[in-house]
């Protein structure tokens, strides 16, 4: 098929042929994500997916969309783009599974100042890896070149995930009661939130990214670019055996904003601070930036990427399932008590 070209459009800053090259380079990455529901490959006007709702009485679709935020600035600074797509997928699918839904498919959106095919392919390679981890098909996406609106080296990345759950299995806060137990799934680090503060604390962009700290087992930049953990597989394994009462993805706003989102009125999550397994990077941020403890717990995940609330009698079984399915570090974080809706850290 003859490809279209526009020298005039290229002179204005949009290179159509670079777009074609990007698509060709990313095809092998997208192919890794294909699942039984995929109907066609990429390149059409819409992504097609055949829905299999077998065994569900009332199938409900669940959607989630998010981006990576200013963590992208570090990826751009270091010209390392192959893992940032994992973050994008994680931010979306981890939200979807909080409802008890199995992610089905994913789409990405990249806006850039200049389409450099190799860079775009590297970004999409990360998105594809995230989709593989989430057992979700990458069925489409968009790369938009924005000359004059964005600097040539800049880009933004966002994603969109769709999952499915039987209506009777939807997880919400309605059944949470005092006496329930809250479990913690450890994070891999800062994940994808709080990076505006992180960049300020460490003077990222002014050489701070290259510093080494004895409490970190790798250079600072590598610690900060560690991808957000994807919790899909362990949570789906848990859902086969136990119906959790609530799940919270600990993102922007930390404990104080995200945990209450999965609590009903009259219930408070009581957590002993010494029981939180805080990762070294957070102690380092607090020390280097003189950040108050309250602000730390109100900004970062502090080493807890996801919380799962279960009935007390299900706690041991839930931990065993998580330990056997990729979350050996899962632990009891706290309990639900009667009180004002919120979080009590003591």
Q: Predicted regions span which residues?
A:
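N-terminal amphipathic/basic leader segments beginning at the initiator methionine
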Residues: 2-37
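Residue-level signature of catalytic and energy-coupling elements of molecular machines
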Residues: 15, 66, 179, 249, ...
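Short, acidic (Asp/Glu-rich) active-site segment that either coordinates a divalent metal cofactor
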Residues: 156, 169-220
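Glycine-/charge-enriched secondary-structure boundary and capping motifs
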Residues: 3-11, 119-134, 150-157, 209, ...
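Short, glycine-/Ser/Thr-/acidic-enriched flexible segments
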Residues: 53-54, 67-68, 162-164, 188-190, ...
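Glycine-rich phosphate/pyrophosphate-binding loop regions near the starts of catalytic domains
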Residues: 28-188
